Amino acid sequence: MTTPSYAAIDAPLQAPSATLDAAARSLSAATIAPHPLQLSGLHKRYGAHEVLRGVSLTARKGDVLSIIGSSGSGKSTLLRCINLLEHPTEGEIRVGGEPLRLRRDARGDLECADRKQLQRVRSRLAMVFQNFNLWSHMTVLENIVEAPIHVLGMRKAAAIKAAEAYLQKVGLYERRHYHPAHLSGGQQQRAAIARALAVEPEVLLFDEPTSALDPELVGEVLRVMQSLAQEGRTMIVVTHEMGFARCVSNHAIFLHRGLVEEEGDPAQVLSEPRSERLRQFISGSLK
C-alpha cells in the first residue's frame, strides 16, 4: 500500500473554519471568473447565403482552440465576427464576461451600439491575419508601437520598451528597424504576432497564420505560437496545420457549412472522427 506524501506536515495548524473559508473563497473566485470569450448562436448571412448557422463556443483562460474545416466552411468569417470586422446577423458575443451591446444596422445585421465599448473590447482581442497586414511604410518597430501609443495611450518610451521585448520573444529584435519588404514571409508573420502581443490582449485570434508562407517558413511561426500556448495565453486558431491542432491545442472544433459538426479533445477528434465529413476532411489533409 502506497504511503501518501504530506508535503505540508510541518506547516502551522490552521483552524478548520479558516481553512474552509479560504477554500470557499477560492472556489467562489474560480466559479465567478468570466471566460475570456463566449459566443452563443452566432449567425452570419450574405443575402440569402448563410455562412454561419448558429455557432457557439467558449474559450476559457489558457485555452488553445483550433478551428479546422474546408475552405468556405465559415472559419475566417467566424473570427472576423468575433471582433466585429464583420457584423453578425444573429447571436451574442461576450468578451471577458461583458456582452457586446448590439443593434440592427440598415441591412439588418448586428453592429456595435456603443463605440466606446467596441474600442474597449477590441483592446482585449488581437488578430493575426493570413497576409500579415503590416504597414509597408513603417519599420517593424513602428508597426508594433502604433496601437499601444495611439489606441491604448501608452507613452512612447514605454511602448518602445515593450515592443522590443516582444521582438526578442519572436526572434526579431535585430530586425526592428527593417521595413516589411525586407523581411521573409515568416519574419513578417512573427512581426505581426509581436504587434498583436503589444496590446496585451486577453485573447489572440489567428486566421490561418501559415497559409501564405512557403513550407520551409511554417515551422518558425508555429514554434512561436507553441511558446505562446505554453505561456498560458488564450488563443483561437483557424488552421490547416493538423499537427499543431493535435499537439498544441487543447480543444478542436470542426466547422462544416457554418455549423460545429464535431468538437472535443484534439487527439480524439482527429484520430477517431465520428462524422463521415470529418473523416473525409482528415483523409484529404493527409494527402
Please annotate each region the language model reported.
Residues 68-70:
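The feature captures the beta-strand-to-loop junction immediately N-terminal to the Walker
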Residues 178, 199, 231:
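Conserved signature/switch motifs of ABC ATPase nucleotide-binding domains
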Residues 179-183, 187:
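Conserved ABC ATPase signature
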Residues 204-207:
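Catalytic Walker B motif of ABC-type/P-loop ATPase nucleotide-binding domains
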Residues 263-264:
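ABC ATPase "signature
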